[in-house]
């Protein structure tokens, strides 16, 4: 199934003269996760359908979703990286486009533009937060330290996280500081990865799929813009999720969502990086918080409705908590007409993008310097 959907994605890009798709979804582990979740959602919508028709519908919709989603992030990725030659292929592609657009609108409509995090210089002793490693270490110590203190030493020993007789304080410090170290390693390695990937993809984009770019894991964005945006996005996304979880408890929701690290971190950190690039610090704090709320409420609704809550979990990433529940409603209540509507919607996305910027649409991937010159003239 993943292979068929991937080939369909490639065909759509190969026919870009008509389809207007420009990016290929290359994040393999994400493709497998999404195929598993899509299978359940489509089976829920068409329980009496045979294996082959379900697989065909899945391949069609996933191939279109991968092509449309990665295509949505082309311009914002090129803008963030100054033409590095990739787009984002992950679980929050529609969210990245939406929040980037909202960030830009918010910054333009405000009386005073919000500075980007990388442009801010804190005064006095606060200047230590200008260094990403220090800022992340302190913030994570406060954040995770508070959680670990609430859990308590006895619980950590019982759960075998902490050995008997070991220092509880030292465990908190090393756990929090390790997070900062691992994040720094991830950010440092990203630029090397991007350089190698774009170089290896050049042959394909020049010979076989002219002007196409690879859609890659969202973590590649962490090597661009402000490193502190990653930490800010994680913290405010977590606050949004915790608030939403509290609301579910107060409202006695039949489905209770527990915050998972991957949706909290990778969705909201990535949203913050792109939001900061378009709208500065305010956007980097606001939109991950809103995203956290949407992740929890959306996941609770869809997981409870389709029955996945009974099996212990759901892929609570942004697109699958917000966009795919809408697709599922259309397919459930409109049957094959709903499938057609979803397919038409995904096919229409690049067409609309193209109509909004005919001159620059393909130029942004083929010659970014010329694209910037074109935009400067307007």
Task: Give the positions of each predicted feature.
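Signature of multi-pass transmembrane helix bundles
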Residues: 2-196, 208-217, 307-378
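Hydrophobic alpha-helical bundle architecture
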Residues: 14-22, 218-304
């Amino acid at each position: 199934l993943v292979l068929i959907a991937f080939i369909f994605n490639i065909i759509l890009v190969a026919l870009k003269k008509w389809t207007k798709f420009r990016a290929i979804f290359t994040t393999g582990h994400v493709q497998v996760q999404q195929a598993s979740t899509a299978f359940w959602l489509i089976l829920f919508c068409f329980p009496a359908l045979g294996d082959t028709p379900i697989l065909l519908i899945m391949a069609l919709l996933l191939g279109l979703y991968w092509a449309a989603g990665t295509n949505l992030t082309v311009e914002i990725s090129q803008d963030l990286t100054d033409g590095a030659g990739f787009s984002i292929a992950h679980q929050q592609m529609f969210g990245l486009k939406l929040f980037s657009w909202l960030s830009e609108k918010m910054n333009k409509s405000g009386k005073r533009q919000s500075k980007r995090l990388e442009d801010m210089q804190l005064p006095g002793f606060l200047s230590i937060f200008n260094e990403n490693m220090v800022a992340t270490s302190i913030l994570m110590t406060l954040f995770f330290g508070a959680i670990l203190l609430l859990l308590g030493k006895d619980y950590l020993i019982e759960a075998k996280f902490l050995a008997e007789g070991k220092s509880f304080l030292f465990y908190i410090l090393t756990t929090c500081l390790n997070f900062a170290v691992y994040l720094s390693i991830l950010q440092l390695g990203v630029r090397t990865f991007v350089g190698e990937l774009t170089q290896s993809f050049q042959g394909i984009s020049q010979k076989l799929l002219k002007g196409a770019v690879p859609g890659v894991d969202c973590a590649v964005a962490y090597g661009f813009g402000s490193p502190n945006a990653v930490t800010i996005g994680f913290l405010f996304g977590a606050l949004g999720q915790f608030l939403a979880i509290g609301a579910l408890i107060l409202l006695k929701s039949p489905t209770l969502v527990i915050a998972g690290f991957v949706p909290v971190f990778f969705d909201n950190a990535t949203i913050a990086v792109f939001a900061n690039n378009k709208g500065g610090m305010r956007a980097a704090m606001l939109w991950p918080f809103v995203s956290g709320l949407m992740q929890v409420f959306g996941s609770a609704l869809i997981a409870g409705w389709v029955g996945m809550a009974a099996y212990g979990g759901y892929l609570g990433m942004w697109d699958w908590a917000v966009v795919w529940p809408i697709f599922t409603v259309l397919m459930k209540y409109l049957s094959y007409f709903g499938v057609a509507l979803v397919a038409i919607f995904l096919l229409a996305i690049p067409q609309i993008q193209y109509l909004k910027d005919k001159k620059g649409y393909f130029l942004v991937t083929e010659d970014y310097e010329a694209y910037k010159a074109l935009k400067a003239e307007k």
